[in-house]
Design a protein with these regions (language model features):
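Sec-dependent, cleavable N-terminal signal peptides
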Residues: 1-12
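Activation on beta-sandwich/Ig-like modules and their edge loops
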Residues: 10-198
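Extended, solvent-exposed regions of the mature portions of secreted/cell-surface glycoproteins
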Residues: 185-219, 228-229, 242
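Broad, structure-driven detector of short, well-ordered beta-strand segments within folded domains
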Residues: 221-223
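A recurrent domain-boundary module in secreted/ectodomain proteins
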Residues: 225-248
Length: 248
């Protein structure tokens, strides 16, 4: 397994709920402020230093590449943020349409409301202060970095498994892979929702749960209750559920 669980329950975080790139139509354009990511942990806990939410490419053009930081939200530093009294923190954009519980911490405008389209992997990680060399990016000069960076390629040999130099140094607490319908796709998390698997090559861990959503592009995903595992699909003890979002 590529998932490395945190050293203590109090430090463990989970991606509890996520909605990426709501669909649009000619009469109902996509609203950037409708995207959301909810994180779950211990009630009132302060998130440890070196904790990040990251996006990792899952398409065949740049598999394993870390998405850019900044307003796009590809790399979000969660260090020092405090979870609400119900143990949750939600990432939203100003003008969002949601009513949020007063017991939930709200983190606004750390993305531009334009999370990557469904062909990405989302992870909660802690770097433990450990540096990992990047691929040098456009300069070709590798740099050792203790924080995730867009020059980091988590899968340099493109085999669908996060390279050991990252899993040995960093803790991957939780993750989800969301795939569309490219001919070759890369899924690095232990739960994968794919629009279709028919005629596709999906490079992944052999232990991962793969859900084929029957040619429907799921955009909303959530953990069931206080689940901590990676079962999904039509099973009685599922940990994850997903669904489509109407465009109007």
């Amino acid at each position: 397994t590529i998932m490395s669980i945190g050293t203590s329950l109090s430090a463990q975080l989970y991606i509890n709920e996520i909605m990426v790139q709501p669909p649009s139509s000619s009469t109902s354009p996509k609203q950037d402020n409708e995207e959301l990511i909810e994180i779950r942990g211990a009630a009132g806990a302060t998130i440890a230093d070196n904790t990040y939410l990251i996006q990792v490419e899952g398409d065949s053009s740049d598999p394993g590449d870390m998405e850019s930081g900044g307003s796009q939200g590809g790399i979000i530093d969660l260090s020092g943020k405090v979870l609400g009294s119900n143990g949750t923190l939600v990432i939203l954009t100003t003008g969002h349409p949601y009513t949020v519980s007063s017991e939930t911490t709200v983190l606004l405008d750390v993305t531009d409301g334009n999370l990557e389209d469904p062909s990405n992997n989302f992870f909660l990680i802690n770097t433990n202060g450990n540096s990992v060399e990047d691929d040098g990016g456009s300069t070709g000069n590798p740099t050792s970095r203790s924080a995730p960076h867009s020059n980091h390629d988590l899968d340099e040999n493109n085999d669908g498994i996060i390279d050991a130099k990252f899993t040995d140094a960093w803790t991957f607490m939780d993750g989800i892979s969301i795939l569309k319908d490219s001919s070759t796709m890369y899924a690095y998390a232990e739960v994968i929702f794919a629009r279709t698997t028919s005629g596709k090559t999906i490079k992944k861990s052999t232990t991962a749960t793969l859900v084929d959503t029957s040619n429907q592009q799921f955009r909303y995903f959530a953990r069931i209750g206080n689940s901590t595992g990676y079962k999904a699909g039509e099973v009685a003890d599922a940990d994850w559920v997903g669904g489509t979002i109407n465009s109007s």
